[in-house]
Amino acid sequence: SSRGKRHAENLTPQIEFVLEQARISMDEISVVAVDVGPGLYTGLRVGITTAVSVAFGLGVPMIGVTSLDLLAYPVRYCSKLIVATIDARRGEVFHANYLQVPGGVQRVSEPAVSTPDDLAADLLAHGDEALLVGDGALRYSETFAVLRGVDAAEPNIAYPSADSIVQLAHAKALREEFVTPTELE
């Protein structure tokens, strides 16, 4: 896809820009973190392949963080059920549920894919107050807007952020929760 091609073309310059902004060189990197999805296939493959190449080239371990975890983390102070959503295209959303815990969020459901209507029905059936975050919530806002006690997070946090991956990957690195390239395929 053209979007995947743009991602491939922009990724290396973006890495160089971040290194420059942080005033560090590539050889100062001790671990490589990567968003492992769910998400659109081409963009994920480009990101994962780049991360594997960098980690292999530097001889450092890797950490994988899911996109849904990355979406839930910025709203970690919310006391409601947090539902991270990603537009899966074709009228579906990837989603997982989270609860606030000391220091972050804990996933309380396995990542799943369903139609927005099915997700809305599940939320209605459980009756919990919830905060929806992610581009799936934005894309299908009309489906979720009618649910009582269900709010949408601000659009500015609808996509995984570099800040979140740094925070979550750092915690995983301290616990030595490393992954191998074959685990990411």
Model-flagged regions — what are they?
Residues 1-38:
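N-terminal beta-alpha supersecondary unit
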Residues 18-22, 57, 75, 162-173:
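Stable alpha-helical structural segments in soluble proteins, enriched in small hydrophobic residues
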Residues 21-27, 56-65, 178:
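Phosphate-handling active-site elements
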Residues 25-30, 109, 152, 175:
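Acidic, glycine-enriched active-site microenvironments
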Residues 34-62:
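DPxDG-like acidic metal-binding loop motif
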Residues 61-160:
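Surface "functional belts" at beta-alpha junctions
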Residues 153-185:
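Acyltransferase
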